[in-house]
Amino acid sequence: DYRPRARFPGKLAKTGVSLELELVETADVLADLGRNKGSRWIVGFALESDEYAHVNALRKLKEKNCDVIVLNRPTAIGSESNRIELIDAGGKTVAVYSGTKSDVASQLWTWIETTIVT
């Protein structure tokens, strides 16, 4: 969502004073895809952390013109495991997968193959 405004070549040496890092928004690739969707299916991803996670993910799905959105939580960051919910355009959770990240990815891919591709 954000990147540093400027890149520093090499290593920044300590100077004994605080460093301020300015961030700028990155391009919204998912929104661009949604605007040019045509007949393609779009699966979006939403990392949400509060009690409104489902609502926020559904809002993102609609704003970005996705067909489904994968909701996951920050607890997955740095973890070997994950739990995701697949939410459709009607706001319904159509699948929940949990396990190792590899297992969850495999389950998600199987869902995509059987639901979208066929």
Model region roles, listed by residue range:
Residues 1-76, 85, 94-95:
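Glycine-rich phosphate/dinucleotide-binding loop and adjoining beta-alpha-beta core of small-molecule
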Residues 66, 73-118:
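Small-residue (G/A/S/T)-rich helix-start motifs and N-terminal tracts that mark the onset
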